[in-house]
């Protein structure tokens, strides 16, 4: 396992995940009967500040079809949590207009690169172009100075 599991923190994430799914109208309990399902949901809502008991609730009441998706969500959240601790692994976001993003995505796809790799490549290309332009300007000035002296 690459990332350490923190039971209290992850139980809080699980609680939030389940409450969000319930509010979106998804069935989060294993019960078909509405009253039993509502009773289990009310019990879950009461466990907001008791993270250890959330895991017990999950074992007893959660819809088994939701288990795999919840695990994937928690795994992704754990990864983001630990990556955010280090500057070099922290994800950044930038605002792009849709047309800009579309062109960038198309270029990345043609080059077979990720968006980040494509942006780095574009920056490097611009830097090389700038360096080349500076060298050409210097060369022109030197050439004019040589021709002007004669």
UniProtKB/Swiss-Prot annotation:
InterPro entries reported in the protein's UniProt record: Arc_rbn_hlx_hlx, MatP, MatP_C, MatP_N, MatP_N_sf
BP term (GO), one: regulation of DNA-templated transcription
GO cellular component: cytoplasm
GO molecular function, one term: sequence-specific DNA binding
UniProt keyword annotation of Lipoprotein present: no
Pfam families: MatP, MatP_C
Keywords, ordered alphabetically: Cell cycle, Cell division, Cytoplasm, DNA-binding
Subcellular location per the Swiss-Prot or TrEMBL entry: Cytoplasm
UniProt KW DNA-binding keyword: yes
Family per record: Belongs to the MatP family.
Subunit structure of this chain's protein: Homodimer.
Known role: Required for spatial organization of the terminus region of the chromosome (Ter macrodomain) during the cell cycle. Prevents early segregation of duplicated Ter macrodomains during cell division. Binds specifically to matS, which is a 13 bp signature motif repeated within the Ter macrodomain.
UniProt-recorded name of the protein: Macrodomain Ter protein
Record organism: Salmonella typhi
């Amino acid at each position: 396992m690459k990332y350490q599991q923190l039971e209290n923190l992850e139980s809080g994430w699980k609680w939030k995940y389940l409450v969000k799914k319930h509010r979106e109208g998804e069935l989060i309990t294993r019960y078909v009967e509405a009253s039993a399902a509502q009773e289990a949901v009310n019990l879950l809502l009461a466990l907001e500040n008791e993270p250890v008991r959330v895991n017990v609730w999950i074992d007893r009441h959660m819809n088994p079809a939701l288990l795999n998706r919840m695990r994937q969500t928690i795994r992704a959240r754990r990864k983001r949590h630990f990556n955010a601790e280090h500057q070099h692994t922290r994800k950044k976001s930038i605002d792009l207009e849709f047309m800009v993003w579309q062109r960038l995505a198309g270029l990345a796809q043609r080059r077979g690169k990720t968006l980040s790799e494509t942006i780095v490549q574009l920056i490097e290309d611009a830097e090389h172009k700038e360096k080349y332009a500076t060298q050409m300007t210097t060369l022109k000035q030197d050439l004019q100075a040589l021709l002007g002296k004669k």
